[in-house]
Amino acid sequence: MLNEELLPIWLDHDCGHDDAFAMLLAFHSKIFNILGISSVHGNQTVDKTTINALITLEIIGKSNCGYEVVKGVRSPMCRPEQVCSEIHGETGLDCPTAELPKPTQLPITDRPAIQVMFEKISKFYTDNQQKQKVIIVATGSLTNVALLFAVYPQIKPMVEVSLLGGSINFGNISPAAEYNILVDPEAAKVVFESGVKVIMVPLECSHKALVNEKILERISDIEKADGKQTQFIKIIKGLLLFFADNYKSTFDFDHPPLHDPLAVAYLIDPTIFKCKLMRVDIETSSHLCLGRTVVDLFSMSKLQKNVHVCTDINVDKFWDLMINAIDNCYNHLYKSNILK
């Protein structure tokens, strides 16, 4: 594909296990022009999620290929920082059964992430004669994105947002709220009320994208076709198995949901989702329902509909996209002589 045929995106995430798979899907689906990567607090501290983004570039064979990681904000707009060690471990990318590579490149730390985001996104938009908007794929807290919109409001006509977060009915960090929204509800409110097109992939979709034995077998089959046992597949399965163990101990799930790649999958093939434009408000004051995405399913609100909410997913087609990307990554690593 020529560059002008690729879909321009910016990856903004709190790189944990499922964020790493979102990166893999984005880099190895061959339809994206990835303008940059920013880290943010969430699954772990921003220091750790920044390192994890760099590690993931090593794993997927994209380090030192011109893709920069810029270190984002370390805390929510109005609240104390929180992390999710019970799911992602002490590093945010724990993988006890396989040794992860060390980063060979450094992040950008001398300028605020939102400045870098603004410069790169606005340059692309201008150079492209305003023909293509850049889609910010947000799979962590929305603090970077909210601050970007607040400090550089002129960027709003240049972007859309595809995010993994929120829910229609239930939460995963409280009875009412999903984690990415709850860690910074004020930021989510800014983004949802920005006037920018927002695509929300909620828990109702991601809790159907389960990593079961059949999926693990399909991943194993990628290297079996070559009669090999590779460090890459060992890492991929190790990350998923650690994720599975923690979902079992925390939620008693038999299989873990691979949340974050869905925000990328929507951009690859929107037809695998059912989606509806609805009014969504963010609860920022209730003790019981803090961080809830209040989704107006029946158009009761008089306020303008503001979010394209995904309500269902074709799980088989999602996994076809994900397995194909893992296979593409595997082949890329061998062709580049990264895997021996």
UniProtKB/Swiss-Prot annotation:
CDD domains: nuc_hydro_IU_UC_XIUA (cd02651)
Biological pathway: Purine metabolism; purine nucleoside salvage
Catalytic activity: a purine D-ribonucleoside + H2O = a purine nucleobase + D-ribose; a pyrimidine ribonucleoside + H2O = a pyrimidine nucleobase + D-ribose
Keyword Glycoprotein: no
SUPFAM superfamilies the record matches: Nucleoside hydrolase
Record key words, sorted: Calcium, Glycosidase, Hydrolase, Metal-binding, Nucleotide metabolism
Binding site for Ca(2+): 14, 19, 139, 260
EC number(s) reported in the record: 3.2.2.1, 3.2.2.8
Active site: 259
Cofactors required: Ca(2+)
InterPro entries associated with the record: Inosine/uridine_hydrolase_dom (IPR001910), IUNH (IPR023186), Ribo_hydro-like (IPR036452)
The protein's enzyme class: hydrolase
Binding site for substrate: 18, 172, 178, 180
Family membership: Belongs to the IUNH family.
Protein name, UniProt field: Probable ribonucleoside hydrolase
Gene source species: Dictyostelium discoideum (Social amoeba)
